[in-house]
A protein has these predicted regions:
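Bacterial N-terminal signal peptides
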Residues: 10-20
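A short, well-structured edge-of-sheet supersecondary motif
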Residues: 47-78, 305-306, 312-316
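Active-site Gly/Thr loop motif
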Residues: 206, 211, 261-314
Length: 435
């Protein structure tokens, strides 16, 4: 038996016991509260400073550490909606759990049964892959996909080299097609469903359906678009707490225990040299010090959401990847640093205080809808066509960023936190630059 096979068995055995005997964390309040003194929750304030030092050194821009449903420590722009990058996959995994639980989706359906094909025609063997194989990144379909990283292209296996459910390959084709299948099978918009089935039940404060978008790569022979999702650190912390509680929220089993168990089953193990990690249903699985199961959603640039049920712990770290500023994930380092601050001396009813997040200090002007509509246009930037359109949320840039008028030639792009400038030609505003 190979060392990877042994590791997979070890992870599976330990992960299967992760929720056994673990006390369920409290649900967060409708608005986040924090411990008045971490000591009352069994943590040293002095030692938790090391977590903030790590945050600063790591170049992160938002951090939330939640213990037993309440905020233990936080820093940065926790209300700012950042691109989740690959963390979006874990959100979609949850939607599959909800909608397979209510019978709308059968994860054993094959691509052939679903009528799934692509511009590059799939073989009969490829079309025998089931939805659950895509959730595991084990479809056996190895063709170009929208939004691929260079490493995905470099390590893509040859077509036909592995039958479905026999080989792990972190595959954007699988992930992209899952977004389309969800809409086909449920008849619901992916992002509206995320809002109705997760954001609202979990009392998320910042997410809106417009924070999701599909985009296509016209240079590739594929009909399936990539999907992007923006979400704040404080909303992701609620999502993580749902999993920390075994799918239970406010007395309701939002995700079945069976789905949680299947999600956190290690179907594949990846050897990164200095460490191993496994993959479940669009979640990563690690063992801290070979004994403590941790589950994580990870996004390019150092974005992480980590769930440690044994310690009722949820950690979210974000980076301003909109500006190209990322960092290392450092999952193990963060968790070890937090756990090293434990004192085990608690009080029965720790004092809680509201978590106060200061809103952005920006001055905007009022502008009538008719005037805002004048700014609608298309232009070419950074290799692709961009749009400014008017809709439900007002004037929106790139289908994702609400534009707030500062003057008749300058708008502030929410979340992106940059200014979009226009010049006037023949009494019409024309896009000029972003700064």
């Amino acid at each position: 038996m190979s060392s990877l096979s042994k590791k997979l068995i070890q992870v599976a055995l330990i992960a299967s016991l992760a929720f056994a005997g673990s006390a369920t964390a409290q649900n967060p309040a409708k608005s986040w509260v924090q411990y008045s003194a971490p000591e009352e929750a069994g943590f040293s304030s002095e030692k938790l400073q090391s977590v903030l030092d790590l945050y600063d050194k790591n170049g992160a821009t938002a951090l939330m550490v939640v213990y037993d449903g309440n905020v233990l420590v936080w820093k940065g722009d926790i209300a700012r909606r950042y691109d989740t990058h690959s963390m979006r996959k874990s959100l979609v995994s949850a939607l599959y759990g909800i909608y397979s639980g209510n019978g709308a989706i059968d994860i054993h359906k094959t691509l052939k049964q679903l009528g799934i094909d692509d511009s590059v025609k799939l073989s009969e063997e490829e079309r025998s892959a089931e939805i659950q194989d895509l959730l595991k990144a084990r479809s056996g379909v190895y063709i170009p996909a929208a939004g691929e990283a260079k490493s995905m292209k470099d390590y893509r296996p040859a077509r036909g080299s592995h039958p479905p459910n026999t080989f792990f390959y972190y595959n954007n084709w699988d992930f992209n097609v899952l977004g389309v299948i969800f809409q086909m099978e449920t008849g619901k918009d992916l992002f509206e469903a995320l809002n109705a089935s997760l954001a609202k039940p979990l009392d998320m404060e910042d997410f809106r359906p417009m924070d999701g978008r599909f985009w296509r790569d016209s240079t590739l022979q594929t009909v399936y678009p990539k999907y992007d999702i923006k979400m704040s650190a404080r909303d992701l912390a609620r999502f993580g707490t749902l999993y920390c509680n075994g799918g239970m929220w406010d007395g309701h089993q939002l995700l079945s225990k069976e789905w949680i168990s299947e999600t956190f089953t290690p179907y594949s193990t990846v050897d990164h040299g200095s460490y191993h990690e496994s993959y479940g249903y669009l979640w990563w699985i690690q063992l801290l010090d070979d004994s403590i199961p941790m589950y994580s959603a990870q996004g390019w640039g150092g974005h992480i959401l980590v769930v440690v049920p044994k310690y009722k712990l949820v950690v979210v770290k974000r980076h301003d990847t909109f500006s190209g500023s990322g960092g290392d994930s450092q999952i193990g380092t963060y968790i070890r640093t937090i756990l090293s601050a434990r004192t085990l001396e608690t009080v029965s009813r720790p004092r809680l205080i509201p978590l106060e997040v200061r809103p952005e200090q920006q001055q905007f002007i009022e502008m009538p809808e008719a005037d805002l509509r004048k700014y609608q246009q298309q232009f070419y930037m950074n290799g692709r066509t961009r749009k400014i359109e008017y809709g439900k949320y007002g004037l929106v840039f790139d289908e994702w960023f609400v534009l707030h008028p500062v003057s008749d030639s300058r708008f502030y792009a929410e979340d992106l936190r940059k200014y979009v400038s226009f010049r006037w030609e023949n009494q019409k505003p024309v896009f000029d630059r972003i700064e």
